[in-house]
Amino acid sequence: MGNIEGGADTVLDALMDYFSQGLLLLPTHTWAQMGEEYRVFDPVKEDACVGILPNLFRKRPGVCRSLHPTHSMAAYGAGAEEYIAGEEENNTPCTPGGCYDRLKDINGRILLVGVTHARNTFIHGVEEVLNIPNRLTEKPVEFYTVMPDGSRKKIFMRRHYNAVQPYISEDFVKLTQAFYDTGAARQVLFGNAECILCDARGIFEVTRHILAPDPECIITSPEIPASRWSDFTGGPYFHV
């Protein structure tokens, strides 16, 4: 983003002011540390593994954090608590009907700041909705979430896994041109940072269109040809 007076706190101040009448969501994932050897998630104490902004944001007044043990979100603004409610019941990283999936239903936008679609967790959610094979572990992990009253809630959760590509999301970049060509995403600047602004509904519809004839093409194909989306008729997703 370049040199910003006040650093990360200034960025958060601007975002929270802009979204004061809307809903601001930041990922506060803990998948990097949660696993077979570390299975208790305390949403108050546990740092996120996805950068400084989420960790500062989750501690701010008025911000609430979902209770998902590996893929939590922090929320601020209108309907924040309602939006993240119930995530402690989910048994996959991006369960259909969960916080990630519902972005497409609330006209949500996703801003990828200085990163590519390899960090676009929403696409994991699309794959879960479409029930793409070979994306989750067969055996679930037993996690415990510390609830607001101090009790511990047990959940058995499957995690992201593919035997061919251990880092599934690294191949999401193969969809980049499809998203640009169909208008589901556009390049923007946030400060000096090159960013990708995505329409959640558009990302869902384009990904579904491409995966329908070949559900595993993101991993099995070296690249995805434009012919796979040239007949797509959805959108427009951005009106300004």
Language model segments and positions:
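N-terminal and secondary-structure boundary signal
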Residues: M1-V240
